[in-house]
Amino acid sequence: MSGIFIAIILLTILALLFGILLGFAAEKFKVEGDPLVDQLEALLPQTQCGQCGYPGCRPYAEAIANGEKINLCPPGGSATMEKLAEMAGVEPEPLSATEEVQVKKVAYIREEECIGCTKCIQACPVDAILGSGKLMHTVITDYCTGCDLCVAPCPVDCIDMLPVEQTVKNWDWKLNAIPVKTLDEDCQC
């Protein structure tokens, strides 16, 4: 019985020593990231669609910090591009020519043709497609960014990209362009 307690105590001491060693190494060899890259990445839509020519939003944020164009993110639209311009300290540019003419589109699945293969669900970077294996799928249009990544994997071509009508609910009001003054808590107004 005492052999088990000795083994437990030795393993506990060994675990504590390794924990201290790993904690020290983590602090000693810590790699600081660029705070500008973190801020730029937070502004991007995080769809990881690759339409900008980079494999994800983080590499595109790093490229912007190194001087790349800020108008390459179609899912983000002009609002994201304007915020990126402000953060990067450059002039806003119009979005790429193809995006400037296009209207916002969302995916639409013709459910009567859907075979339930789940390939579109796996391709969607924002989980905007609802469904399960061998059952029809549908798109949650409020979540769809229009990145078009779900269309190509569909084996029966039952996914279309349809333009979104401008309504009061989805109109771009640009409310964050209105300056707002915040009051301090100790202000007696």
UniProtKB/Swiss-Prot annotation:
Binding site for [4Fe-4S] cluster 1: C49, C52, C57, C73
PANTHER family: ION-TRANSLOCATING OXIDOREDUCTASE COMPLEX SUBUNIT B (PTHR42859:SF3), OXIDOREDUCTASE (PTHR42859)
Cofactor: [4Fe-4S] cluster
One GO cellular component, as annotated: plasma membrane
PROSITE patterns found in the cross-reference section: 4FE4S, 4FE4S_FER_1, 4FE4S_FER_2
Region of interest: Hydrophobic: 1-26
Domain 4Fe-4S ferredoxin-type: residue ranges: 105-134, 135-164
Protein name: Ion-translocating oxidoreductase complex subunit B
The enzyme's E.C. designation: 7.-.-.-
